[in-house]
Amino acid sequence: MPQMHAVRRDRAAAVAAGLGADAVLVTSGVNVRYLTGLVSSNSAVLIPAPGTAVLATDSRYAGTAERGCPEIELLVERDVARALIDLARAGGLGTVAFEDHVMTVHAHRELTGGEPGQAGPELIGAGSAVDQLRMVKDEEEITLLERACSITAQAFSAVLDRLRPGVTEREYALALERTMIDLGADGLAFDSIVASGPNGAIPHHIPGGRRFEPGDLVTVDCGAQCGGYHADMTRTVALGKPSAWQREIYQIVTEAQAAGVAAVRPGMDVSDLDAVARDMIEATGHGGHFGHGLGHGVGLEIHEAPIIGYDRDGTLQDRVPITIEPGIYLPDRGGVRIEDTLVVRAGAGAAGSAQPLTTITRELLVL
């Protein structure tokens, strides 16, 4: 693990060099974890290009950092970003790239204020350049994602019998989440979405006290987290014989989702992938009922690059985990969403393919 993190820090140093900076200051917790292995609520890492990286954290995490990151210099301070900028100044670094997409204006002012007479370093924005390093996964990361997806599928199957009339959305969500933990998840990827009946028209409905009723469609969006890596899966089930309109939109979404998965290949523009599913839904007259993007990357965060949408830039690459999740949402009636997590793979031919990590059937489950 230390060697893996060292390789990642070398890539971050190359980002700094590419920006014309002497170092990069990483302050977002997820990126600090990616580059050092430390999980904390207060840490930052300064990575010179070239030079020895320095990890700063406070006394609560110092012992963990010493044991888990023995190969990196440790600085124990409460104001971690300020301590590292002071260190950069003392070391004569003239320019430091920083994560301007996550740092607040107040924090930036604090870092650039300094004491009277103090010079530099100059801070320049790195944007999401460090985030982009996380997009392509190594096989160890993919294995963790595969485990998270497997636990998610097992938990969903284990509590299917709780999807019955009289159970509330909240009760079912709690049973599902507890089962993921019991099956070995380190935590939840996110708070589960359980949307029944008319609530299914709300893509990110918060589970409440509504009781499942016969004739409901119930959309369940859930995920386990293993080793920090997040699974994401959505299935919609029918409680009793589905009506004609329910079968119709389920069939449309199923076909659009399958087409999206089949179209995945390295080098494909994310907007083109979105169009594969979106065009199919629009052709049925439901384009106005599919308002979100087709999918997104997953990893140490539940939503990360690439974002797959009609108005997004970027291309798919080998070893990038993504979701494919079209939906149709009919106000006051209900909705359907089907979502799989998969990995973009370069195949033997030019097209490549998608490696599915979600294993639950896409066929309509009638309970």
Specify the residue positions occupied by each region the protein language model found.
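Active-site neighborhoods and metal-handling regions in enzymes and metal-associated proteins
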Residues: 1-367
